[in-house]
């Protein structure tokens, strides 16, 4: 068997390696604005949920056109079975 000697790794002094100090803030943060300009003033609060009947899941309609995928899978099955 071939035994290799253990490779010695020098120990790093953590006092020499320090992270940079963060830049000081020029003004304190006011708030977080999600998804828009903070100049816009609307009468509706962003925490309010609309309660109209047209704003729910019933108003969402998605049409799925998968005829191309069905035709492709059928022809590939036939060609593999009889090819």
Swiss-Prot record:
Annotated spans, Disordered: 1-83
Record field: compositional bias (Low complexity): 43-55
InterPro entries on file: Phage_T7-like_6.7 (IPR020134)
Protein name as catalogued: Uncharacterized gene 6.7 protein
